[in-house]
Amino acid sequence: MIPDRLFYLLNKYKISPSKSFSQNFLISDEVLRFMASYGKGKVLEIGPGLGFLTEKLSKACDKVVAVEMDKNLVNILKQEYNFDNVEIVCDDFLKFEEKNFDTVVSSIPYAISSQVTFKLFEMNFETATLLYQKEFARRFISNPGEDDYSRLSVMSKIYSEIEVLKDVPPSAFYPEPKVWSSIAHIKLDKKFEINDVFENTVRALFTHRNKIVHKAIYHSRDIFGKGKEFKQSLDEIPYKDRRVYTLDIFEIKEISDWLEGIL
């Protein structure tokens, strides 16, 4: 039983889950097996913790690269497991440089979900199966016009196709988080190239997601280094009277391209 194994390791090494690392160990064998079934070939695991998912991935995949920044957990992984096909790397994933994998399977720390995901978007892999906070996952898949449609929704749609596979209750973890989680399946599918102007446009628009476009851009004019005189320049901006939260990614790209022409 995984819970028994968890408490054995915690007691043996006199450790407890670290709040600073947002550690909630996934202990549901059902969920672990479900996630591991999506791993194949060379798989990346971010934050292996005490190795419960790592162990299952090692049996299903050709090679596992497990990146863990907690030195105590790295030492435990190396002492407790004798993996032939697992490389345990002590590093902060946000600084990790290797980019080519067949799949990614991970229960990632909720506190850095956005940073981890956007780093993954710049890597090369076929699919990623990731465990997120449920609310975060819903923002990922939200569409124009929906309540959760956000900057995160826009960027995820540009880089990928995402579906939520299943929800996971707090009881699947130790310690139990206060929120439900969701397993998301990501396939890279970049729709178009983006630049700094596009990223600033998205940030400017969704800072005022309920406003109409020309007002949202004007009220965020400092993002573009502009003053009050910028208002007159926005008379011909595309979709000027549309509410920001109704725009799809291609309409936002039109707005960005137009802004790039006048900045």
Predicted regions and their residues:
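Catalytic cores of RNA-modifying enzymes
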Residues: 1-200, 204, 250-263
